[in-house]
Amino acid sequence: MSKEFSRTQRVSQQLQKELAMILQREVRDSRLGMVTISDVEVSRDLAYAKVFVTFLCVGEQTPESCLAALREHEVHIRMMLGKRIRLRLTPEIRFYYDNTLVEGMRMSNLVSEVVNEDKRKQQDSGREEDQAGEE
């Protein structure tokens, strides 16, 4: 009987849940805005965790400035995480900006532009055929 989830996947899910709670309730930094954890990748030995985040930036905030502010809290967040989870070693946390949402929107816009361009060309060629048929 095989396991449905590997240990790294279970730890990854637990880390994502706990990190979301920590960021929401315990990290007080106005530079962060609203932080969403989109994914957590844990190394096989559970020593390292890549945390992918997105931000809802307000006003002067940029994703880069929010990420820099979040990275200042890495050590403190790891300490709080160590108190909440039962692992022999608390993973070293590294935060990365997750731009998949931005890239997805960009790709969607490109597809929409191509479809609209194609429709316009079809309409133009249809008008040319109508004009040729009238003559």
UniProtKB/Swiss-Prot annotation:
It is found in: Cytoplasm. It comes from the Bacteria. One of its GO terms (biological process) is maturation of SSU-rRNA. GO terms for cellular component: cytosol. Residues 116-135 have a biased composition (Basic and acidic residues). Belongs to the RbfA family. Monomer. Binds 30S ribosomal subunits, but not 50S ribosomal subunits or 70S ribosomes. One of several proteins that assist in the late maturation steps of the functional core of the 30S ribosomal subunit. Associates with free 30S ribosomal subunits (but not with 30S subunits that are part of 70S ribosomes or polysomes). Required for efficient processing of 16S rRNA. May interact with the 5'-terminal helix region of 16S rRNA. This is Ribosome-binding factor A. It comes from Vibrio campbellii (strain ATCC BAA-1116). The gene is rbfA.
